[in-house]
């Protein structure tokens, strides 16, 4: 699990440095619309036609294991076999990224607070439920690897919600970004 957070932290660092060193030159009027959503690309090779078209249409740039798609508001992480494993969705204009404007996973909305996310993703505590009892709405794991954002990991959904606060108890915090993994 520690390796997972190191990878996610690396993504944040790469995105920061990639955008800090390059002036944001994104004309919103000329930004190509996302022809395919992140759901289409998860689990597919970057050489797959739908993924390759998305990368080309959105002027994505490869940085290590990442396809940085600033005009589309997302970054794609690929494994050693070039399979898209994670989509990092930016919900606001930040770090040179345009806000992702596609549908968010699990009925989440871009203006949801931590409290509303926990309500939407919550499961009633039931000791007989499989794969096990969960506290209502609480993430399976949480941390603040960059000491700026709180990362709430919902393993059962393959989703990590990143908030604009390092505090796990700031129920008014809004969503900064969402990672969706396959």
Model-identified regions with their sequence ranges:
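A cross-family detector of function-defining hotspots
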Residues: 31, 40-93, 104, 108-182
